[in-house]
Amino acid sequence: MGDVEKGKKIFVQKCAQCHTVEKGGKHKTGPNLHGLFGRKTGQSPGFSYTDANKNKGITWGEETLMEYLENPKKYIPGTKMIFAGIKKKGERADLIAYLKQATNE
């Protein structure tokens, strides 16, 4: 399992410009991520997803996020997420540890 504090720094540096995590947080360029774990792709209420995201049909969890965050466009071809991904597995684990906590508070 990753380091939550390191993951928070990664989120602030690489994700926060497009995503919020708190309950009731607004959508930005990307959707609010509250309640992410256990939710299917393309299901955050009020966000306009691509058909690719809606039709992927996987449920977000540690393993699916680990694969997705390495290369989002490869995992969901047609996603509008323009982020290139995080190549280092340890950094992805840290980010996922943070997301698991922050999106559930």
Swiss-Prot record:
Nucleotide-binding in keyword set: no
Kindly list the positions at which N6-acetyllysine occurs in this protein: 73, 100
Query: Is Metal-binding a UniProt keyword of this protein?
Result: yes
- Main localisation: mitochondrion
- Positions contributing to heme c binding: 15, 18-19, 81
Q: Name one GO biological process term.
A: apoptotic process
The domain of life for this entry's organism is Eukaryota
Tell me which UniProt keywords the record has, alphabetically.
Acetylation, Apoptosis, Electron transport, Heme, Iron, Metal-binding, Mitochondrion, Phosphoprotein, Respiratory chain, Transport
UniProt-listed InterPro entries: Cyt_c-like_dom, Cyt_c-like_dom_sf, Cyt_c_1A/1B
Modified residues annotated as Phosphotyrosine in this record: 49, 98
GO MF annotation: an example: heme binding
Q: Cellular component per GO?
A: cytosol; mitochondrial intermembrane space
Q: Which SUPFAM superfamilies match?
A: Cytochrome c
In its record, the post-translational modification comment is: Binds 1 heme c group covalently per subunit.
Concerning its family, UniProt says: Belongs to the cytochrome c family.
Biological function? Electron carrier protein. The oxidized form of the cytochrome c heme group can accept an electron from the heme group of the cytochrome c1 subunit of cytochrome reductase. Cytochrome c then transfers this electron to the cytochrome oxidase complex, the final protein carrier in the mitochondrial electron-transport chain.
The molecule here is called: Cytochrome c
Please name the source species.
Hippopotamus amphibius (Hippopotamus)
